[in-house]
Amino acid sequence: MALADLALSNIWGGLSSDFKKKNFSLYGQWISILTIFLCLALGVANIFHLGPIIVFSIICIVQGLIVLFVEVPFLLKICPLTDTFVNFVRKFDGNLPRCGFYLLNAVIQYLSLTLQATSLLVVAILFTISSACYALAALKHQEYLKSSLDVTGTGSGGALEAQVGEHVVRNVL
C-alpha cells in the first residue's frame, strides 16, 4: 500500500510541477499520454463493429502504440526495435514535428466519420488538442520540454528517460 501511495504522489507531484511551468509542450505530452490509453481502449472497443470501421479501429490501436513510443522515449531503449522505427520516432523530437504528427493522426481518425460516427471521434479530438498544444508551444517559442515525472521516488525530478537508465545500471551491477 505504501508503494502505491508513493507512486501516486510521484505522479501527481510530477503532473502538478509540469503544469506550473506553463509550457504548452508539456500539456501536449500529458494529453498525448491520455490519448494512448484511449487509442488502445477505443480501438479495441470499435473492432466489434461490423463493416469497414474495423480498419480505422486497427489504425487507432497502431496509432496508440506509435504514440507510446513517441511520448515514452525510454521504451525505444528497452524494446527490441528496428533502427528504421527508432529513427522514425526520433524525428518527432520537437514542437513542430509533433504538431504535424498529431494533426496527421487526428485527420486519419476524422476520416472514420465518413463511414460511421463512433467513439473514435474522441481520439481524433484529443489528437487535435495535443497538436494545438504543440503548435502553441512553437508559436510562443517555448522550449520543447519533457515531463519531470519522478517514477523512482528519489526526488531528483529528472527526465523519465534518465531515471530508467539508472535502474538498468543498478540491475546490471
From Swiss-Prot:
InterPro entries: TVP18/Ca-channel_flower. The chain crosses the membrane at residues 28-48, 50-70, 96-113, 119-139. It is a multi-pass membrane protein. Pfam families: Cg6151-P. Glycans are attached at residue 23. Golgi membrane protein involved in vesicular trafficking. This is Golgi apparatus membrane protein TVP18. It comes from Candida albicans (strain SC5314 / ATCC MYA-2876). The gene is TVP18.
